[in-house]
Amino acid sequence: QAVSQALERKPDCILCMDDRLTLLAMNMLKQQGVRVPQDIRVASLYDSSALAESSPAITAVQFDAYALGRKATQQLLQALKGREVETRVELGYQVSMRESTKT
């Protein structure tokens, strides 16, 4: 349902939260006759062999979710104590560019 709603806004790209949701979105797009990457580009915020082996292979961003959660928890605890928190936090990531985002 979320994919159908997103398509109504005619986005350039759909970014999914994990590999399972990404594969579900790809199936729905295929059922609706939407071509990836010709009509829309698709990427995931989690990488897996299933994404690399899908057709088309799906672009993915890999990051340390544990480090993200740890930093978010630290920030929340600081805020709850009334202390100033960082407004900008940078964490490392790696992008695996694949067929689903090529134009």
What are these regions (language model features)?
Residues 4-103:
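Flexible loop/turn connectors
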